[in-house]
Amino acid sequence: MGYTNYWHQHRDFTKIEWDQIKEEYDYIKEVCEGVIVDETKKADQIVFNGDSKKDHHHETFVIRKIVKTKKDYKEQDLSFNFCKTAMKPYDLAVWHMLCFINRVCSDFAISRDR
């Protein structure tokens, strides 16, 4: 089943914003234990997916403190991001994080296939 969350990040997050986002992610890791698997390796990123042992994984969700600056192709909109979750259980964690970030950063636009 196709189901995707979308967002536009037009700028880098400030230190204050990023600290709030990371704090919320710590909360999500706690309440979604067994649903999401944290794959974060760098302090300036949040990376997670669903639990592959339960076949609850799909595309990995990645949020970066610093926006991407190098295009992969000429017409690429560097602000545009998406994560296909196929409505698997970790979709709630993805959407929660996007809604939280949108609340913290009003210029962070979000939408989904719903």
Q: Which residues are covered by each model-predicted region?
A:
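Acidic (Asp/Glu-rich) sequence patches and key acidic residues
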Residues: 1-114
